[in-house]
Amino acid sequence: MDVDQDAKENKKIKKSPAKKSPKQASVTKKPLASQSASVANVVYDSALETAPASGKQQTKKTIQKKILPKSALPKIVAAKKEPPETSEKNTPPKQSKEIPAPNLGSAEFSAIAENMAELVDQGRKALGAALGGVDGGEARSELAASVADATKTLGFVAEYWLSKPERAAVEQAHLYRGLADIWQQTLLRYSGEETPPLVIADVGDKRFASPEWQENPFFDWLRQSYLFTSRWAGDLIDKTEGLDAQTRVKAAFYTRLISSAVSPSNFVPTNPELLRATVEAKGENLVRGFRMLVEDISAGHGMLKIRQTDEDKFKLGVNMANTPGKVVWRNDVMELIQYAPTTSDVYARPLLITPPWINKFYVLDLNSEKSFVRWAVAQGLTVFIISWVNPDESKAEKGFEAYMHEGILTALDVIEQATGERKATVAGYCVGGTLLATTLAYMAATGDDRIDSVTFFATQVDFSNAGELQIFFDEERLAAMDEGMAKTGYLDGVKMANAFNMLRPNELIWTYVVDNYMKGVEPAAFDLLAWNSDCTRIPRANHSFYTRSCYVENRLARGEMVIDGVKLNLNNVKIPIYELATREDHIAPAPSVFRGAKLYGGDVTFVLGGAGHIAGVINPPSKDKYQYWTNGPVVGEYDKWVAGAKETKGSWWPHWFQWVTAQAPQKVPARQPGDGKLTPLCDAPGDYVRVKS
């Protein structure tokens, strides 16, 4: 799932320092230049031989002309000539920061040699863990499908540009001019001139935060050249004509993946911060990093499961998923949890929550300060939540129908036994909401009226423009997934987690690759990332039905989905609906949620929250963060609805609470788990949530 927004909110949490080995030298941080000075000087000397005859002044004029058009160089800043404070005769040229090369004695070389030997050994173990943990045929099948799809997709882009050489020549000229300008600016810096950068990193791009990326001309040249080339490549996708929407999204995705992977920040020789750390630690940082790499590949059963937080700091039922309650029902698909009341009176109408099964339910009960469940209980609601099973091969045939019958519909039966209430209000989140919408259409078709109001959190029912996840669900990829699931009976949770991570490669992959495996630094403790790392498996039948019926064929929106022989039509759903979308959601994009909200036959209250798929939903009022927007009925286009919407600061939770209690305002004395016809099985959060993938 997407955790990008809350990860940004976690900036103030410092990374826990790596445990130092007794062999690790104690050093002080100093500016880096000697490691790159010799390379830069050779490049500089060779470039001077081809520099314009008019020399430095001509070079400065070239920069000031701003050769590149804006479309070819986003965020370009022209260098300005500043008058010197004193004459050039009396002012020696400024030199780039340098330090003498480290003075290495025999002891240091011995430490380096030992660390390099250990590094080789850890690399061997990492390779062994990767090769030993995955079935070779299955791994090749999915990898081959991914490579084939990337090649085919980018081939369409290449075909457009190469079909007319003059068209390609124009874009090549833009690239060459931009790189030439950056190089000329670098020459000026080496000659002592203070010149501003031509290419500025995006706000929030932390890869180049170290001052040495700007202070050292060589690394500044690398940084600017990389950023310019990456943006140029992205512009090529935008300018390519004749691509359908899906192919364009995929082309941008693959281009972003490649650009992120080749960033100079990802390699020791081209990252000044990494280079310094490696020299100062004599390579021991790499040894620590490779040890973590071996552990993470082993944890992923042959696939890399990147550690994003210190999971040992969190314990279910202690400082996560700790709202008091009882498991009151268990079957092959779910455990049903009833939470203990904290008020003397409660609303008569119970609330059932159906979370997604691609992650565990406790995203809605992270801790005492970030718990939608705890907050809802405190407002006087009787809350039940489904904890989905983390399936093994024995659950391979549990499909969408089973999750509907043995999940939501069974939960309604159990709630009536526990509370005496025949009707309930139900909330669904993400794919849990898609299942809920499917269930509502089924209930409407079969005359079942036990749900009298419904809430959707970041839920799609129309998948015609379903966001970046569509990248993974074309027929070739699904066939490869089916081949793998035929052997295991499920989709491995690590694969799903890696797919979500690839949607934000800089923030959710390469940041941790650099920090964990190159710097050798353990990640900090962060509750949301701990939940995100606690991935679950998905039954083969469920995954195949959902991805094909929704993402590929869009059957629910078209009125063509059939469950148990019943054809479903969302327009038959007439009950009141509260529909929450979040503005920065890339998994369930707000325009897609808005479009789907038009398919229901009853009254829909559409609310747009700030932030993304997780942070926009889990936004407690006490945090006083973000905002939400409200407007009239769900009609017209999404952009027009947003343009006329009213913005309210803070959490949407109180707004929802007023809506949901207005549907059924009656109150009754508080009900404890076990008061009804059911005997509690165990304390919340239950057993299913503790099963690891």
Which positions does each model-derived feature cover?
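Amphipathic, low-complexity, repeat-rich surface-exposed segments
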Residues: 1-333, 346-347, 384, 596, ...
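Short beta-strand element of the alpha/beta-hydrolase
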Residues: 347-356
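Alpha/beta-hydrolase active-site loop
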Residues: 397-418
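Alpha/beta-hydrolase fold nucleophile elbow
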Residues: 418-431
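Short beta-strand/loop motif that positions the catalytic acidic residue
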Residues: 579-581
